[in-house]
């Protein structure tokens, strides 16, 4: 009896949905859609790497495309012009976030910044982060930490260079980014404290990203608890909760350590600043911080802080290893500009190596850390490229597809940093063909901090070392296969042999 009623409900719901869609399409000029199946819509056309699936569909359907993922309509943007309309022209109306299961859980009910819907609370949190944690004065105070950690990296790589053994650069560069982040945020040295198990931290970061970007049935079949039931049966609820508990244990340990009255307060890190604000806030203060807010914001800082540096360094070294002429060119510039026999690299050296900046831009173009940025949700009716997008509609901007658009880029699949010579295109959110940090109100607030880690790390790798392939490998053997959802990592770890330059 119950099954019969459920089937009757689904048939009725689907029928009404089809009728409703036809009425809406006759009133509105909705974006084109690829053919879909009953109930699941276009879900069967989305593979393990959604950004690649969406580009293939957009090539046949259009650069403003309406997909039906289960019962949920999603607009996918795949052109520079459409992205500019969403992120600049209609930024205010398109800058909220959808209520998704994974992001709601990991953000503790939207007590973070990245996944919180747009509103006064979000504005206060962003104002706090930009004004207190990512201001110029704070960023300058973090530079010394970055330089010290890069020096430690050079020392460890030099030890590996003695016996000419391959180094897992994927692990090494994750360790560098995590080490810098842990000192800046937690005041703890990654390699001199209990946080020495990089594999566990790496695993936790990847699991957290997967949880935040996961395709759960509850998000696409929200009617009558059907999606929730499927997620429960499949174990998705348990997987998400396990990640949350592991992340919470780490953050609680850090907060407990900072709350210890005997702890030295000579140098205030990010957690110290947040706890001070929480303890001193008054009941009439516009910014309200609780322990959950601190944990939510720290989650954003950890994930984004490690990813921007580590993943982009890994992809950059991958492309340079695959293109030895470009590797030679960028190393030649670095060593000519900085001179011989340098013992350390400093922040002042970053402005002396313009070709390295072009290499980084080209890496951002081919390998944006978050290929679909973060999902947006409309707060009002807007028109994009002449198409109607109603309120409460999810929007995904395919930055990865835009970065490989043959209408914008010559030889779009090739790694050619020279394409940016004399080009005004930059990555700070004003040029919509290159969007590694997003744009508009939702642009990444930690962009400057992430760039400093990335630039210093690469400068040290390329100045102090030449890089050889392991025995038996050729440059063509280095693959660029991807893995991930919200962010995309190199699936097969990059392993190279460091050769210390005298």
From Swiss-Prot:
One of its GO terms (molecular function) is monooxygenase activity. The chain crosses the membrane at residues 1-21. PROSITE patterns: CYTOCHROME_P450 (PS00086). InterPro entries: Cyt_P450, Cyt_P450_CS, Cyt_P450_E_grp-I, Cyt_P450_sf, Cytochrome_P450_71. It is an enzyme of class 1 (oxidoreductase). It comes from Arabidopsis thaliana. This is Cytochrome P450 71B17. Belongs to the cytochrome P450 family. SUPFAM superfamilies: Cytochrome P450. GO terms for cellular component: membrane. Heme binds at residue 444. Its EC number is 1.14.-.-. It is a single-pass membrane protein. Its cofactor is heme. The keyword Amino-acid biosynthesis does not apply. Keywords: Heme, Iron, Membrane, Metal-binding, Monooxygenase, Oxidoreductase, Transmembrane, Transmembrane helix. It is found in: Membrane.
